[in-house]
């Protein structure tokens, strides 16, 4: 009997030891798994923060239309815009082609309305390059201030047609070439050429498009975006259409841009170009970052994929910017407001139950001097108001 109890006690003890060891093993694996998870959350440099931005449901717009209106929060990129993706792709492609070598006094030159320049300047700080940015003088001062803070050489250029050698893009191209041949300047210049560089649309085909598809679990009816260089709408549309050709792609275009008529009628034309109304600089809008009056290589990729287009007025963009702040706490820039106006128009056209995806491109903090400046707006004959409904968006 004593041996029986002794064996039982021994068995219980062994079982206790086994359970103790099993628990220790479990805890060690849990700690290791937790440590591994933490390690995976560490990225290498600011470039590692680019992409995988959140998708946000814009509650007020969704509730008002009965559609699921989602927006990719691209302002959450470290440079606060989707241009981070483009800048990184252009620089990496240039490195692969031997056009850029880090820490050799090489400089990246670009002509930009601001956001791409900010992304380039930010990445040049991290990747070992200088940055030289040429931007139109009518763009918000906030952007040039950020560029200078990031160490970029900034030149604000008087707006001019693209055929003018002093156009900001042509100025950037010319100075990049001069840098390379001038032996008195160390290193060489690389012209990023975002309007024509295929790395632009490829950045969105490789990252933004797949992210949208994954975040929506492949369930979306339409995608809406504006176009400046054309790279964003080209890359995302090309990816989404490759997954589901039935997805509707819609262009949101501001006043003065010829893309609206190019999509609808095949002619690059704006009403401002009518006989008797021509001006030296046709694009006359408070909206920054989208709208153009020429075909770019990147937009040529997008054009056959775009199914429809909406013209969005400055007044509508201003009203939407205030509406989003008041009803959703979303403080966004002018191109984002344009996108949201177009999203509501399309939602009204499609009817309840559809899912529409667009982009929130940059924060409102870059637009204090124009979009959120009441004095500036009144000079443009725009009276900023906080709308209580979406009646300012026609169906």
Swiss-Prot record:
N6-(pyridoxal phosphate)lysine modification, residue list: 83
Domain of life assignment: Eukaryota
SUPFAM superfamilies per UniProt: Tryptophan synthase beta subunit-like PLP-dependent enzymes
Cofactors required: pyridoxal 5'-phosphate
First-listed, main subcellular location of the protein, grouped into a coarse class: mitochondrion
CDD domains: CBS_like
EC number: 2.5.1.47
Membrane topology note: Single-pass membrane protein
GO cellular component entries: cytoplasm; mitochondrial outer membrane; mitochondrion
InterPro entries in alphabetical order: Cys_Synth/Cystath_Beta-Synth (IPR050214), P-phosphate_BS (IPR001216), TrpB-like_PALP (IPR001926), TrpB-like_PALP_sf (IPR036052)
Transmembrane segments: 6-22
Membership in a protein family: Belongs to the cysteine synthase/cystathionine beta-synthase family.
Name of this chain's protein: Cysteine synthase 2
Phylogenetic lineage: Eukaryota, Fungi, Dikarya, Ascomycota, Taphrinomycotina
